[in-house]
């Protein structure tokens, strides 16, 4: 009987300890999916970053006046360009391989961003990691935003892993 009570007590204790983690995970999931795209983050009135679109996300983008989506996924969903075009939104795909970002990726991204510097732009990838990192780089290298300020927006989305931190450091160190 004592063993049964001990096992029962242990099970109850584990369940009670797991509840806050489950609630936190649900809140994080809800937070991650707020806005038109996963991990959506508005940098300013003309620039936002986000991951894949959530339900109703395309209509939300249109309602926010987004004119251009720069998609950094190396394998974007088919039909993305057509869906956005129906809403009057231009779609630009600059494939950036998650595990192997290159200098040329940043160069192409910078050209697209500079071309659309006066437009309302969403920079997108799968989870808003590539998008927020490339946006951070563009703001620091091209727009000359203080690194501390740009980093706040980057960290609102994620803390870059070693590969991406090294990539960003390399771009910044070699920038004119």
What is the role of each PLM region?
Residues 22-121, 133-176:
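Cys-dependent protein tyrosine phosphatase-like superfamily
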Residues 1-7:
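Positively charged n-region of N-terminal signal peptides that target proteins for export
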Residues 124:
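Short, surface-exposed ligand- or partner-binding patches at beta-edge/loop junctions that are enriched
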Residues 8-9, 136:
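A periodicity- and composition-biased signal for non-globular, repetitive helical segments
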Residues 9-22:
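Bacterial N-terminal signal peptides
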Residues 128:
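Substrate/cofactor-recognition hotspot
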């Amino acid at each position: 009987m004592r063993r049964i009570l001990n096992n029962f007590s242990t099970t109850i204790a584990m369940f009670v300890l797991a509840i806050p983690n489950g609630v936190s995970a649900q809140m994080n999931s809800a937070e991650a999916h707020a806005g038109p795209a996963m991990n959506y983050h508005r940098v300013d009135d003309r620039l936002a970053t986000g991951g894949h679109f959530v339900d109703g996300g395309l209509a939300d983008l249109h309602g926010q006046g987004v004119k251009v989506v720069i998609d950094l996924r190396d394998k974007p969903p088919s039909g993305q360009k057509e869906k956005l075009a129906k809403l009057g939104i231009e779609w630009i795909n600059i494939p950036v391989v998650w595990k192997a970002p290159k200098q040329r990726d940043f160069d192409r991204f910078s050209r697209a961003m500079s071309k659309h510097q006066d437009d309302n732009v969403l920079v997108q990838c799968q989870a808003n990691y590539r998008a927020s990192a490339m946006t951070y780089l563009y703001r620091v290298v091209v727009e000359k935003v203080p690194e501390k300020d740009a980093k706040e927006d980057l960290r609102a989305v994620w803390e870059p892993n070693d590969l991406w931190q090294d990539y960003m450091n390399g771009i910044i160190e070699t920038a004119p």
